[in-house]
């Protein structure tokens, strides 16, 4: 049987929810963005400290939806790539421009985007997937922004999204793993851009695969590709890779100080590609966890 949450743990989740709500124009919009996770009534009860009728399961669902997204106790290290993503997001939000950031998987793009959204208002990060249809894309975007779209058509929902965004102070849309979107969904970006030009920043994050896809689409004169390429400024913004020095810093920030253990993490996490050392931060994290467990094991 699972252990019951303490009052202190519930208050911690309440603080997470309050921090989450502070990123929206109103608590009502924050509650709408959690549609499917919790009801407005439950949202208000937790915010106001009325915990009596809220189940532990609901508290944990709220925590999963609004929490930091990082493992308990894991310290994020601001690598060069992390800082570059934050700088590009800040520029897009400040000047309402559009860019497409590309870097290999596991470099920390998503983490940087979510960390930025936690400390800046009107920033909405939408995770993209290959099975997203137009209706899914628009519905998820509406939910992120805090719009209830029951009874609305896809086109009407898109209009509501645009109307809501243009009323905000420097809104920013971040489409994570944008290369996974199908062509039909990408066409919606063109419609969004046309309606939001100079009114909303837009940033895509993806692997470099998108460059090949766009180049091929341009050669084949595929519908929408020329307009899409034009709207991202006809270029992709690459990020620098994670260095051995940064992996060392991540190890030390997360409690691993033994030089031999750190060397093991580096060996297990490195991959040679085009004669260059590349590190996947997911592998780094897994290897650090392994070394910490080895260090904590009782010695016979």
Language-model regions, residue ranges each:
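C-terminal alpha-helical "lid" subdomain
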Residues: 1-64, 68, 72, 235-300
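Sensor-1/coupling segment of RecA-like P-loop NTPase cores
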Residues: 100-105, 181, 193-224
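Glycine-rich phosphate-binding "P-loop"
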Residues: 71-76, 146
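A short helix-turn-beta junction within AAA+ P-loop NTPase domains corresponding to the substrate/partner-engaging
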Residues: 121-123, 217-240
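Pre-Walker A adenine-sensing motif
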Residues: 76-93
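Mid-core helix/loop region of P-loop NTP-binding domains shared across ATPases and GTPases
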Residues: 133-134, 139, 148-188, 195-201, ...
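Walker A/P-loop nucleotide-binding motif
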Residues: 94-115, 129-130
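Conserved catalytic segments around the Walker B and adjacent sensor/switch elements
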Residues: 120-130
